[in-house]
From Swiss-Prot:
The gene is rpsQ. CDD domains: Ribosomal_uS17 (cd00364). Belongs to the universal ribosomal protein uS17 family. Pfam families: Ribosomal_S17. Signal peptide: none annotated. It comes from Shewanella amazonensis (strain ATCC BAA-1098 / SB2B). This is Small ribosomal subunit protein uS17. Part of the 30S ribosomal subunit. It comes from the Bacteria. Keywords: Ribonucleoprotein, Ribosomal protein, RNA-binding, rRNA-binding.
Amino acid sequence: MSDKIRTLQGRVTSNKMDKSITVAVERLVKHPIYGKFIKRTTKIHAHDELNQCNEGDIVTIRECRPLSKTKSWTLVDVVSKA
């Protein structure tokens, strides 16, 4: 098992929950037959202790222990404000 903690960067799509945000993380996937690269989006719930994020912000999140049923990521920093 790897000791490296996973970190991702994405855009905040929702901050309506208390101390929680929803982050959309985009990745490129190559189509198996045609070879074209396609954008795929994953929505991740992350913990925002200080409620400092707004919709549209670019943020860095890292994996942590499960904090709730759907939340196992936490906010590291805000890269740029919307």
